Every structure is written in C-alpha cells, then in structure tokens.
C-alpha cells in the first residue's frame, strides 16, 4: 500500500514529462501499474496460446486477464481512498495549527513599530552623512510622522538636543558670526 501520509503534489500542465508522471503515480500507488502490466502479460499469453491453437490454455489466460483487471480496479479504488484520507488528514492538521493570541499579535505589532522607528532613525542618520559627504547643509529633517510613531511606541527621541552639524562651506565651522 502507498504511504498514507504522502499527499500528491499537483503540477501545472506542461511541466511534468510522462516519465516523471509515471514515477510519481507509481510511488503513490504501485499496485495499479503492476496490475496493468500483469493484465497485459495475461492478454499477451492468451494471444500466444490462440496462435498455437491451444484453446483451453487461451481460455485460462483470458480468465486470468479478467481477474487481474478486477484486482487492478480494486487497487485503484483503494489507492484513491488512501490518498483522499491522507489529503483530509493534512488539511485537518493545517486547520489545527496553533493560532496567535491577541497578546502575541500586540507584541508582534509593537516589535514591528520599534523596528520601523529604528529604521527611520538609521535612514535619517544615513541621509545626514550622505549630505555632509556631498557638501549640503542638512538640518533636523526628521518627519512629524516619525516623531508621532516614536511617541506611540514610547521611545523618547531627543530631537531638540541633537547636535547640528553644518556642512563645510570653506570657512571654519566654529565661526558662526
């Protein structure tokens, strides 16, 4: 019998060769292809016996063919039922997956907001560094949205006492007057 825990993988049309399809189907239910081969063998033997003129042996192989066809159909139905049961079991396990509680969802949202704040801070610092490197004067370009998010998360960001670094303009930086 096939492994009942294995569920067939569905391939889009045109992506699977006939050899790959045969291998996949053989792994899912090996009794069906074996039954087909046995049925074809019995039919071939009955044709050989008919050519030899042995009608009793031909009838024996024709009856064997009918029996083997019946066994192949039984294997086909049993394999289909096993695959259906495995698919239902996999769907049931997926439905019973642990769900996140409200507290876990809030914690994940808080972590995401904190990460976004750190990202905005890093982008701000990077923009200042790039502007200084390019010679432009950048002054406290922090957006109101970033300040609002920092207040919502509870992170205190001191934008007032942040040192301003004027870009070099050819004069000395310490002479502001």
From Swiss-Prot:
Could you mention a single GO BP entry for this protein? mitochondrial respirasome assembly
Q: Which residues form the HIG1 domain?
A: 3-94
PROSITE patterns hit by this protein: HIG1
Q: Which GO terms describe its cellular component?
A: mitochondrial membrane
Give the way it sits in the membrane. Multi-pass membrane protein
Cross-referenced Pfam families: HIG_1_N
Q: Which UniProt keywords apply?
A: Coiled coil, Membrane, Mitochondrion, Transmembrane, Transmembrane helix
What residue spans carry the region label Disordered? 150-177
Q: Where would you find the membrane-spanning parts of this chain? A: 31-48, 61-83
Coiled coil regions in record: 83-129
Q: Where in the cell is it found?
A: Mitochondrion membrane
For this chain, the family text in UniProt reads: Belongs to the RCF1 family.
Q: Report the protein's function.
A: Cytochrome c oxidase subunit which plays a role in assembly of respiratory supercomplexes.
Q: How does it assemble?
A: Associates with the respiratory chain complex III/complex IV supercomplex.
Under PANTHER family, the record lists:
HIG1 DOMAIN FAMILY MEMBER 1A, HYPOXIA-INDUCBILE GENE 1 HIG1 -RELATED
Can you say what this protein is called?
Respiratory supercomplex factor 1, mitochondrial
The record lists the organism as Coprinopsis cinerea (strain Okayama-7 / 130 / ATCC MYA-4618 / FGSC 9003) (Inky cap fungus)
Name of the encoding gene? RCF1
């Amino acid at each position: 019998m096939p492994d009942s825990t294995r569920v067939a993988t569905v391939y889009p049309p045109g992506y699977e060769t006939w050899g790959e399809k045969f291998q996949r189907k053989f792994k899912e239910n090996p009794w069906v292809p074996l039954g087909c081969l046995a049925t074809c063998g019995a039919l071939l033997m009955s044709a050989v016996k008919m050519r030899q003129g042995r009608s009793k042996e031909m009838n024996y192989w024709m009856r064997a063919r009918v029996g083997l066809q019946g066994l192949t159909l039984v294997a086909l139905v049993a394999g289909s039922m096993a695959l259906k049961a495995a698919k239902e079991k996999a769907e049931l396990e997926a439905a019973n997956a642990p769900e996140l509680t409200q507290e876990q969802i809030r914690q994940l949202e808080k972590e995401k907001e904190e990460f976004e704040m750190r990202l905005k801070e890093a982008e701000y610092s990077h923009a200042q560094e790039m502007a200084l490197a390019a010679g432009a004067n950048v002054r406290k370009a922090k957006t109101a949205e970033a300040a609002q998010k920092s207040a919502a998360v509870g992170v205190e960001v001191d934008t007032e006492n942040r040192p301003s670094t004027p870009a070099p303009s050819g004069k000395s930086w310490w002479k502001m007057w």
